[in-house]
Amino acid sequence: MPRNIYDNILSDARVKLTELFKDNFRQQGFFGEKWVATKASKTNKRGRGSILIVTGAMRRSIRSMIRGMAVVFTSDRPYTALHNDGGNFAVTVRSHSRTSKKTGNTYTVRSHSRQMNMPQRQFIGDHEKVQQALGDIVFKRLQEFSQRLADDFNRH
């Protein structure tokens, strides 16, 4: 097969998958599977709205590119993979001053680490709908290619 059919398939896949993954942000879920809700305390501080969108920086940071025979999605935000995959991780709490509510005395809290659990809120990855979209793209491009071959054959 000519190289440009691969390029066309990969280019179409890149556009379609980017659209599908950004739709996951709008739908607040991964192809119909709703994300785990945030804690009530977080909702009160931030107000109502989308679970993963406060400033929109993570959604805007998602980039897609074609590398070889694959479409690759990247982000320059360090927390993107953490949200997409979920998991436990350690956070270092810096030393700081705290004032006691009872006595009014100020004391220093030493630096320490705390375990955090991030629930998975996947928005990029393999899914049945991704496979269906890719299948549709390949089928459409192969039909166009075979039609061009038939037209060229009939002209000669």
Predicted regions and their residues:
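Short, Lys/Arg-rich flexible segments
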Residues: 1-156
